[in-house]
Amino acid sequence: MLMWPQPHLPTHPHLPTHPHLPTHPHLPTHPHLPTHPHLPTHPMMSKETRQSKLAEAKEQLTDHHPQTNPSVGTAASDTKKKKINNGTSPETTTSGGCHSPEDEQKASHQHQEALRRELEAQVHTIRILTCQKTELQMALYYSQHAVKQLEGEARDLISRLHDSWKFAGELEQALSAVTTQKKKADRYIEELTKERDALSLELYRNTITDEELKEKNAKLQEKLQLVESEKSEIQLNVKELKRKLERAKLLLPQQQLQAEADHLGKELQSVSAKLQAQVEENELWNRLNQQQEEKMWRQEEKIQEWEEKIQEQEEKIREQEEKIREQEEKMRRQEEMMWEKEEKMRRQEEMMWEKEEKIRELEEKMHEQEKIREQEEKRQEEEKIREQEKRQEQEAKMWRQEEKIREQEEKIREQEKKMWRQEEKIHEQEKIREEEKRQEQEEMWRQEEKIREQEEIWRQKEKMHEQEEKIRKQEEKVWRQEEKMHDQEEKIREQEEKVWRQEEKIREQEKKREQEEKMWRQEEKIREQEEKIREQEEMWREEEKMHEQEKIWEEEKRQEQEDKMWRQEEKIREQEEKVWRQEEKIREQEEKRQEQEEKMWKQEEKIREQEEKIREQEEKIREQEEKIREQEEMMQEQEEKMGEQEEKMQEQEKMRRQEEKIREQEEKIREQKEKIREQEEKIWEQEEKIREQEEMMQEQEEKMGEQEEKIWEQEEKMQEQEEKMRRQEEKIREQEKKIREQEEKIREQEEMMQEQEEKMGEQEEKMQEQEEKMRRQEEKIREQEKKIREQEEKIREQEEMMQEQEEKMWEQEEKMCEQEEKMQEQEEKMRRQEEKMWEQEVRLRQQEEKMQEH
């Protein structure tokens, strides 16, 4: 049987101790045995695993002996030499072949020193291992704690990301609603422009008809003037005829008077017929003028209604623009909230980076410790081989040195008591630390996996944040410019309203028109810039969406997302082309509007000129009507006189002397009657024409009456407006100064906008470069993911190896327990041998005493 010294083995409870031999009260039970109070048995481990772990622990403890105890080898060599020289076994007791007591004491003393050194080396290794365990447990604990914090922060970040996604979706819905409203407004404006075009055509036709009617009225006025001149001549002729009649009554006889009276009567009849025809023509023309005036009034009413509708629509559009501005303000506030959230996220990211750096340091320490362990394992394997050789030599020496060790054990036991007390405390601390380290190690491995994933995500986020900061700076500049442009647009709209009210005087001022044209051009440029900015914002938002989707689906669907990205880029390009086409259409529509407005201005000027001419015609017509009434009164007086003359002529016809003349006159009268009938037929035709003209004139007179009423109202309004215009002129002069200042500012802004456009072009190029970089980064990320997966597989393999090692440790522990039991049995045998040795010594002493007596 091979014997191995175990100074820390307990005594057997059932074996009686020798009366002369000291017991081992200071030796506690082995810490790896199941009876140890501080090391509970693992519930999931079998006996084989415990035995294997105990065996491995013993091997690790014994591996340090050859390095730390060089004296052991020397002692073994000395004993070999003694064995060779003596050539006898230790059990012989003859005087010639046995060793001297001094040599035996020296050998036992050397053997005890070697054992002490071995014990010290074992204690030292145990302390080193306990320190390493405590360090590992602390590192695991800190890493697990950091991982828990990182998980909580990651959850917070995920919840915030979900909130931001929801918020972005709401913003997109609001933007889509705004765009739909804008589209509806644009359609409504297009319909209004079409209606304006139709009205402008109607106005143009009406102006043409008005011009024709004016020409006809001018011709009629000329005819009326001729008729009036003829009437005046006829009246003069009538007066002269009356005078002649009066003279003829005095001078000429009755027959001559009758002939002249007949002649005058015929002339009067012809003149009266002409006057009636002219009166009927005048009535017809008056009716036509009335009808035309009525049409003009109706058209003006329609125009006013359309203008009211247009104003209402403009008010609606303004309300919509105000709503859009409110929505934009809300969007800005929400973006500010997002900025604040992102700043918080950045701070948290910085904290995470600091924690990650600490974890990396811990990982480096762990790697160093693993290297040290590997080196120690190699050394242990080499030392095991050496120790096996030395054990065989030491076992032979142990038989000889057991007698001498007993005397020295008493001194060692006192020291061992102190050592065991310290070791018990150390074991208790080690158990606590080991449990903590195990938990920390498990958490450390989990954290490392998560941290590596997060590192890649954070790197991508940092780049995205840098890009977002640049974009936001640009957006802030654009928003400031838009605010300035909105302020300018409001001022311009106020000026436009005043200009629309001041149409009569602003038309005379050509400079203001030039200013308006400049403002319109500037507005077009501003709108184009706004549209470009909105397109860019949409592009950025779409890119942000794409980045968020890439972050979420990076591990599972990156290839699908890349395909979608390409498709979306093609769609965006198509949308940009559509937007450019829409912009061109809008520009063409605006040019058409400007042309239509110029036509409207011209038509309104013509209408006003026509109104002035109509007023002059109305005044002339009134004067003519008064003259006609006077003529009618004169004609009535003449008819009464002619009636009296006819009565006198009838009395004269009775005169026989006048019968022949009367017959001749009758023949003439018949001829005249035929002529008169022909004239009457012509007159009837003229009367029908005149009636038609009178109906037209009546309609025109009705229109003119309505127009006069409106004109009176308009004149009153115009007087009020003139007062307002005077006040407004002063304001306009002040505004002109402001406008000039604004024009200078706008020119500066245009220059700034051109610079910005150049910068935007550069930024677009940079964005393209960044997209290429992002693609490269994605490829790198994929490679990194592959590496991470490989590392994860390695880690899993290492974990499996660790589990296998733990099982082996348990098996070694069980083996150690079995070996300890065997050692106890060996100790019992050693004690029995010691008792026999004591008996032999007693016998030897008795023999020596007898020898001395002899």
Swiss-Prot record:
Entry-linked InterPro entries: GOLGA6L
Region (Disordered): 1-114, 320-348, 366-447, 481-568, 581-681, 714-854
Biased composition (Basic and acidic residues): 45-66, 100-114
Biased composition (Polar residues): 67-77, 85-97
Highest taxon listed in the record's lineage: Eukaryota
Keyword field: Coiled coil
Comp. bias intervals (Basic residues): 15-35
Coiled coil region boundaries: 103-854
Signal peptide span: none
Similarity annotation: Belongs to the GOLGA6 family.
UniProt name for this protein: Golgin subfamily A member 6-like protein 22
Source lineage: Eukaryota, Metazoa, Chordata, Craniata, Vertebrata
